[in-house]
């Protein structure tokens, strides 16, 4: 969060998109067309997941890809940004070294290609349009298999039951993906899903390799984000393929979480309006309710080396978050000419996407960013409530 306040609109959009590219690319290889191949036999989801985990591993994956991004209206973009507008490219994956994945998205005409690289828990994204490298660490997860091997069907079913309390799961749907027998899983928030409709993932019934991933908005039957590939090959990939060298002059942005410090430079875990209000050096705006949503949490965070505040309202993806930080001169102006809205006696800049909205404005020395998986009208109402 140490750069959100001063980042340009184009870069902010790129970060939102590349974050979803990492999620999709890290879990799936999508196939472009459906063929006439057979479908696998029907089976419970727990059994399908167990069989996928138990399937023999492949030495590597190579594929041509097509990335579709309908988060925002492409007509509002200046130039061809492969992360924002979608693009064709290549994908490689290897199980060596803790797991490696590389996505190459090729920009039309400009030649400003973008690269996504995941090695173990570390990720690096090069945005060729802005000549910026974003890097950081992915959350570490426990190895469920570990020394005990693949989890039992009963254990997997227990996890599915736990997840089912919050997410509606379709079960393992026998599918035909590009002539390959596959199982498709549809997952949708059971409540408080905001603008997120559902996520679909399909995997090869024979080897457990993910074959398709797509994200849908609650307001459209077409995917907002989709990763498609053709000509998939399950062969070993040389380590040299995963060596990416961005230009030496490229700007590097570290997205790793930072330690939050108090006014005296000491680490702080301030929680609650009173504690956070005492930790920041600006008037904290934290009403008990905002846009009809009850206050959920007030937490101290780090912005530009200074203590700032994160105030959340509501629950789940239908909630709203407010980031408040002390204003500084020199912030970059938006590059896409986004709509301006009036918030009280000041003007704000608003970004609306198929999966959520964000609005930022400054008032009396404080910068505000209001964001949520909600329509623009909801973040506008929240901003006015501040």
Report each predicted region and the residues it spans.
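Gly/Pro-enriched, hydrophobic low-complexity segments
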Residues: 104, 124, 170-253
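A short, surface-exposed beta-strand/turn
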Residues: 87, 92-95, 116-126, 198-214, ...
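N-terminal export and membrane-targeting signals
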Residues: 1-19
């Amino acid at each position: 969060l140490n750069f959100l306040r001063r980042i340009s609109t184009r870069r902010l959009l790129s970060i939102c998109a590349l974050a979803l590219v990492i999620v999709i690319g890290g879990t799936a290889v999508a196939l472009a067309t459906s063929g006439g191949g057979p479908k696998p036999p029907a089976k419970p989801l727990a059994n399908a997941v167990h069989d996928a985990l138990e399937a023999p591993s492949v030495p590597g994956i190579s594929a041509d890809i097509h990335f579709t991004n309908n988060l925002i209206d492409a007509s509002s973009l200046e130039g061809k940004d492969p992360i924002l507008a979608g693009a064709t490219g290549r994908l490689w994956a290897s199980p060596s070294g803790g797991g490696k994945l590389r996505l190459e998205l090729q920009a039309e005409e400009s030649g400003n290609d973008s690269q996504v690289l995941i090695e173990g828990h570390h990720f690096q994204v090069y945005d060729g349009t802005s000549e910026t490298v974003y890097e950081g660490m992915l959350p570490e997860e426990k190895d469920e298999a570990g020394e005990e091997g693949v989890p039992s069907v009963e254990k997997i079913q227990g996890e599915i039951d736990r997840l089912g309390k919050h997410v509606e799961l379709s079960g393992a749907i026998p599918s035909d993906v590009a002539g390959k027998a596959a199982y498709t899983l549809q997952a949708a928030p059971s409540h408080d899903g905001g603008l997120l409709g559902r996520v679909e993932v399909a995997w090869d019934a024979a080897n457990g390799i993910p074959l398709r991933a797509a994200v849908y908005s609650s307001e459209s039957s077409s995917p907002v984000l989709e990763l498609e590939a053709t000509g998939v090959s399950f062969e070993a990939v040389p380590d040299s393929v995963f060596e990416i060298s961005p230009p030496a002059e490229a700007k590097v942005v570290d997205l790793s979480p930072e330690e939050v410090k108090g006014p005296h430079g000491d680490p702080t875990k301030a929680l609650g309006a009173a504690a956070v209000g005492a930790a920041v050096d600006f008037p904290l705006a934290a009403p008990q309710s905002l846009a009809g949503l009850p206050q959920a949490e007030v937490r101290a965070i780090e912005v530009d080396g200074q203590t700032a505040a994160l105030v959340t309202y509501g629950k789940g993806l239908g909630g709203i978050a407010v980031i408040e930080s002390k204003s500084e001169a020199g912030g970059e102006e938006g590059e896409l000419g986004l709509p301006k809205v009036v918030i009280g006696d000041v003007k704000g800049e608003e970004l609306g996407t198929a999966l959520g909205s964000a609005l930022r404005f400054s008032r009396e020395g404080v910068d505000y960013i209001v964001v949520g998986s909600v329509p623009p009208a909801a973040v506008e109402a929240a901003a006015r409530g501040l």
